[in-house]
Curated annotation (Swiss-Prot):
UniProt protein name: Nuclear pore complex protein Nup88
One GO term describing the cellular component: nuclear pore
Keyword Nucleus: yes
Keyword Acetylation in record: yes
Region (Disordered): 34-54
UniProt source species: Rattus norvegicus
UniProt-listed GO biological process terms: mRNA export from nucleus; protein import into nucleus; ribosomal large subunit export from nucleus; ribosomal small subunit export from nucleus
Length: 742
């Protein structure tokens, strides 16, 4: 589920040389320079007779990463050792194994550091211990490779003591939990939970005076929203042990006693040692900030007699909607709880009747319970289960690459947990169905996947060796888990970007771009495919983690426990590998037999189809010939039909529009011919008349009258005028004639 299969390219280069870097040699040398009392603890407490184990050792996390660089806290030198995981200028060239930067504290902490925590703005690092807290300011970067102060070997860093006077004056108080306020837009604030059951919020601008204070003890006695059995918890002295922030949400108006507008705030989930969870809302957007009313304890469904354990130690809110809380107990139990919105039940309705300011309390639905194998359960533990009981505090770590996965670190090793049902839960909550039984079916069908990554306590007689650092590299170098053991050995394990079942990849899942997609591959992607069935069979519920060898070379473990350890590993290989592979083999053989029978049946069907295809081809040829003949006959019939229709249309008694127009034109032709004949006769008569006149004019006659020149001129002018008059009259007559004729 956590480990990635196959190479990841150039990103594997740094994974090969990092364990051999000189910084780990320096840290191991610093470990040898501890006080003799601390160095003699393992030797005096470990013997072949296996005496009782010492009290719990504090779990540390002294490692974090930023921008392709790994920061390791050097307790002896009160400094960070910075190792670049990338080569020069971001390339894949392996850097020198002796090259690193040292960030030295100007004002080193006087208390032991148990945890380092990077701020959301990535400009400060919190140095957390049980007796104090400091904020280290990271120096500026410049240069070609963007190193601190251009790549100096040693860089001085300023530190800001947080609540220094408070911890100095209150020597009996201890710091239980610390976390940065999750906003990246505001000035850095850090939230502290101390052993006096008080949560204080400090700003780096005023590190000695808390910005806000949440007194949990008084809230237990004076809160207006309490269940009936809460009065007994104060007398038992139950205190908060951890808290975590959820994603930013919008809260109601009366949460911060604001009447004009709603506000956005971060939900703060507070876990008590008895397993109860409280909720409040924190908003520092506007100075001096707002703290909502403390709600709780949040009801847990389904109810349990032991309230799901009395040794709760850690809480984690996964970044999803609805919020999913992970509650861890020292006995190794993990509870995955879905935060449901509050509903008005009888108890809350009664309380609201006398308290109008009371809000609905969200409830926790315990979706599933998971038990971690903190220490390896050997064969002898079955006879005496109380002899092998082991419990220790658990630290929960988010996975920045996969929101549905988180990791658990404790004194005996590291586990990875993947929640594969989150997307189905979102689909169920987003639907309009009111059937709650499907949710129960979902919890019964698919559980989370737990993988035991590292075991630092393989034998009962060995002391726990808690890891000193844990970090997930979310950089482009590839998602990778880095674990720093108690002896400063670096263990690296690649991670997948998504949650997958803890089963090996099948050959049929390999992608081949040259092979076309076949119907069998399409069937393999179905929800009920045989491939998924084989994956479910091969799914492992346990695994053999990486075992951390003991640093005590002179003391050999008892042979009985070594045999039990080998027997346990053999049993895991037998039950989780060989047996499951045998079951998968039987299923595959059964499947192959069925497929062979189907193949024979399909071959018979194929032969039958070939014969049918042959007969169909012959029939098609015959039908083609008949079709050609029928087509020719049809064409002849069509031609005959055209002739018949033509003759039929010609003999129809009803004339068409064109025929009626032609008839009218033909009826007008005789009248036009008659008018034209009359016009021709008139023209002929005029022609004859003019010819007679011309003959008379042309015939020789003796002039009887002699006219003078003046007379002739007058006569010519008169004739000319009369001729023009006659010409106009002829023209008018022709126009009238043309107008009358046509």
């Amino acid at each position: 589920m956590a480990a990635a299969a196959g190479p990841v390219g150039d990103g594997e280069l740094w994974q090969s040389w990092l364990p051999n870097h000189v910084v780990f040699l320096r840290l191991r040398e610093g470990l040898k320079n501890q006080s003799p009392a601390e160095a003699d603890k393992p030797a005096t407490s470990t013997s072949p007779s296996c005496p009782p184990l010492p009290p719990h050792l504090p779990t540390r996390n002294l490692v974090f990463g930023l921008g392709g660089e790994l920061f390791l806290w050097d307790a002896e030198g009160s400094a960070f050792l910075v190792v670049r995981l990338r080569g020069p200028s971001g390339g894949s060239v392996e850097p020198p194994l002796s090259q690193y930067q040292r960030l030295l504290c100007i004002n080193p902490p006087l208390f032991e550091i148990h945890q380092v925590l990077l701020s959301p703005t990535q400009h400060h690092v919190a140095l957390i211990g049980t007796k104090g807290l400091m904020a280290l300011e990271l120096p500026q970067r410049w240069g070609k490779d963007s190193e601190f102060e251009g790549g100096k070997a040693t860089v001085n860093c300023s530190t800001i003591p947080i609540a220094e006077r408070f911890f100095t004056s209150s020597t009996s108080l201890t710091l239980k939990h610390a976390a940065w306020y999750p906003s990246e837009m505001l000035d850095p604030h850090i939230v502290l939970l101390t052993s006096d059951n008080v949560i204080r919020i400090y700003s780096l601008r005023e590190p000695q005076t808390p910005t806000k204070v949440i007194v949990l003890s008084e809230a237990e006695e004076e809160s207006l929203i309490l269940n009936k059995g809460r009065a007994y918890t104060a007398s038992l002295g139950e205190t908060a042990v951890a808290f975590d922030f959820g994603p930013l949400v919008t809260v109601s108006k009366n949460m911060f006693e604001q009447k004009d507008r709603e506000a956005v705030a971060y939900p703060l989930y507070i876990l008590y040692e008895n397993g109860e969870t409280f909720l409040t809302y924190v908003s520092l957007l506007h100075s001096p900030g707002n703290i909502g009313k403390l709600l709780g304890p949040l009801p847990m469904h389904p109810a349990a007699e032991d309230n799901y354990g009395y040794d709760a130690c850690a809480i984690l809110c996964l970044p999803c909607v609805p919020n999913i809380l992970v509650i861890a107990t020292e006995s190794g139990m993990l509870y995955h709880c879905v935060v449901l919105e509050g509903e008005e039940d009888d108890d809350q309705t009664l309380e609201k009747s006398w308290d109008p300011r009371a809000d609905l309390i969200p409830s926790l639905y315990v979706f599933e319970c998971v038990e971690l194998e903190l220490a390896l359960k050997l064969a002898s533990a079955e006879d005496d289960p109380f002899a092998s009981d082991f419990s220790c505090p658990i630290k929960l770590h988010r996975d920045p690459k996969c929101p549905s996965r988180y990791h658990c670190s404790h004194e005996a090793g590291v586990h990875s947990v993947g929640l594969t049902w989150i997307h189905k839960l979102h689909k169920f909550l987003g639907s309009d169905e009111e059937d709650k039984d499907s949710l129960q079916e979902l919890t019964a069908e698919q559980k989370c996947f737990v993988e035991h990554i590292l075991c630092t306590k393989p034998l009962p007689c060995r002391q726990p060796a808690p890891i000193r650092g844990f970090w997930i590299v979310p950089d482009i170098l590839g998602p990778t888990m880095i674990c720093i053991t108690s002896t400063y050995e670096c263990l690296i394990r690649p991670l997948l970007s998504t949650v997958h079942p803890a089963s090996p990849p099948l050959l049929c899942t390999r992608e081949d771009a040259g092979v076309a997609e076949s119907p069998l591959r399409i069937l393999a992607e179905a929800p009920d495919s045989f491939e998924k069935h084989i994956k479910r069979i091969l799914q492992r519920s346990a695994a053999n983690p990486a075992l951390l060898k003991s640093s005590e070379k002179d003391l050999a473990p008892p042979p009985e426990e070594c045999l039990q350890l080998i027997s346990r590993a053999t049993q895991v290989f037998r039950e989780q590998y060989i047996l499951k592979q045998d079951l998968a083999k039987e299923e595959i053989q059964r499947r192959v037999k069925l497929l062979c029978d189907q193949k024979r049946k399909q071959l018979e069907d194929l032969n039958y189809c070939r014969e049918e295809r042959k007969s169909l081809r012959e029939m098609a040829e015959r039908l083609a010939d008949k079709y050609e003949e029928a087509k020719e006959k049809q064409e002849d019939i069509m031609n005959r039909m055209k002739k018949v229709l033509h003759s039929f249309h010609t003999q129809l008694p009803v004339l068409s529009d064109s025929e009626r127009d032609m008839k009218k034109e033909l009826q007008l032709i005789p009248d036009q011919l008659r008018h034209l004949g009359n016009a021709i006769k008139q023209v002929t008569m005029k022609k004859d008349y003019q010819q007679r006149k011309m003959e008379k004019v042309l015939s020789p006659q003796k002039p009887t009258i002699t006219l003078s020149a003046y007379q002739r001129k007058c006569i010519q002018s008169i004739l000319k005028e009369e001729g023009e008059h006659i010409r106009e009259m002829v023209k008018q007559i022709n126009d009238i004639r043309n107008h009358v004729n046509f």
